[in-house]
């Protein structure tokens, strides 16, 4: 998962919100798995995360929350999100993540990280609402 900087996720009133937790392990090529909840209005939708990236080493756990922009239809949330960036975590850290899928949905996330991890990578992550195909 490509994390960089310490950006703040400031949501507009029309944005959906997201909370997630995930794990990332890597030796050159990394694997990410996790779960979260998408909040749109008064509705909560659980989802899963799977994917990975290149050029990283170590392991970390992360938890975060942020904004989902340009979500015209709920099914537009499903898909592959891309991000480019890097992170370095030793013990604890805070980082920002910005990613976009092919339908123009953007996620801006602030995450707290734990572990020993170093990356400069391109990440490809699949977000899938539970119960959807």
Predicted regions and their residues:
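Small-residue-enriched, tightly packed secondary-structure blocks
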Residues: 9-133
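C-terminal segment of classical bacterial N-terminal signal peptides
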Residues: 1-7
